[in-house]
Amino acid sequence: MTPGPPALRQVEAEIAAELAAVRPGLAAAYAAALPDARAAVLGRLWRGLLYEPLPGVAEQGPGRVRLHDGRLLTGPARLPHDLDPAPRPEDRPGAGTPRPGTADRRATEAGGGMAVRVDGRAYADPADLLAALGLPGSARLAADLERSTASLALSRAGASTRDVGREAGWEAGWKLEAFEQGVVDGHPYHPCCRNRPGFSVAEQLAYAPEHRPVVRLDLVDVPASRCLVAGPWPAELTDGDRVLVPVHPWQSRHRLPELGLEPSAAGVIPARPLMSLRTLAPVDGGPHVKTAVSARMTSHVRDISAASVRDAVPLSDLLTRAAARLGRAAPHIARYLCGAAVRVDGVPSAEVAVLLREPPSRFAGPEEVVAPLAALTTRPASGGPPLVRVLAEAAGGTTGSTTGTTGTTGSTAGSSAGWLAAFARTAFTAGLGLLAMGIALEAHGQNLLAVLDRHGRPARVVYRDLADIRVSPARLGRHGLETPPLHPRLVTDDPRHLREKLFGSLVGTTFAGLVSALGHGDRAVEARLWDVVATAARRAFDELPATDGLRADRAALFGPELPVKAHTLMQIDGGPPGDRWAYLPNPLAGG
């Protein structure tokens, strides 16, 4: 039996009603976006069911999951790195036979073209599916999936139809904020990719980056004695012996009253939200502003702890010193310049805190632009291929690149391999070099940025957001680097934890997305692209001094299993806090 389009769930209907009141012109686009939003979130949930160690799951196989109670789930076969692109006309049911070698990304079901069957009954809605499964600890996640689906449909409905890259051209000096705001769908592998509980429709339209707003930050004025300040605080945010702390307007409305605070000046810093929503680029330039927003976005409440304020500057100094030792291969580090947290009842509050960070675009030279990797692998809201494929074709045409990698797209595959090889050399040299010294980056597509030349070729990398790196005092000490006082959460000498952090983010997310976006579902091309990635990693290891630790790191990177963050598992109630990992077949195995 083939299901019809699902009826609106409660949150979907609530957003539709609010949208009709605050932005009626988007109502039709929102309704049209819902089926594909359901398919996108369902695809992420299905990935988790296929590959993560979830409670209640007994067996996992290609397109099949057996539960402990004996029920059988079936759906599209997919590899862990597969992205869920916006449906193309040729993907629609009845549109013809898929090209040979193309991954079976979507079942020929109703709804958004994606369904998972439970003992033969099809589910096209992710929240419906999870509720029917009844996995232990999954009730809150089911509600989050409903919100994620509805907000994703809103994001797609409101996204600009501007075509990233093609409209502006590299010579135009395209701005970082435009790349960031082009990431409409959020995290490519997280089922709660657009979960924003606590944000109304009006607030999402006013503050979310994909809607391209200008957000006006407030200021809270407090005596210096009532504020924890780390680093050199800027004079323009000082008034005599008082500190002016930038605050997000959502926070001013929803949290400051409960803390006994109010803005001393409202809407005085116009800024554009970046991919993370709570980090903004002031319209007039200067440091980026990372604000506290006490709401759960994707999966975490986005406060800024006192420890993060204290650690920001010394951690920036450590990374900058370590990176400098890599010479010409060094990544640029977008440093935290300073931070502040207002004391409430004598204690620095995570809800009234801020960090100021160098803008990554400062590392771009003439005729260069800086773009987060996540912006390169996402499919533009206007349709068409991911931007990285456009870049690869342009770079290949400029250089005349031929790598011998051919496939469904002919010479385009060779261009893709050439672009990927250039980026992989830079990324692995930086990531593995820092790992050898004792610093494991969380190098996923939001934190890792590429400096692109005027032809779209990767020249260097920039790393930002130091809150989730890991630091090994033992490794640092062997390289003559002293570990500053840091929160214990950041510090570990366990090589497994260091490798999970770097390999899971750089390979399991960043390169996974690039291979999927460039390979376009052609498994033969994807395999050759993974070979390109492995070759770059081998060369990066070969250029580092041979040590026992390095040899162990190398064996782990090319071992049979790759750690990948278990995003779905981490949303299940009852588990331990912190990172959880799934160990999956490693596409670099044997390299």
PLM features per residue range, with description:
Residues 419-437, 441:
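Conserved kinase catalytic-core helix
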Residues 448-450:
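Hydrophobic residue at the +6 position relative to the catalytic HRD Asp in the kinase catalytic loop
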Residues 1-425, 453-591:
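Nucleotide/phosphate-binding site architecture used for ATP/NTP-dependent chemistry
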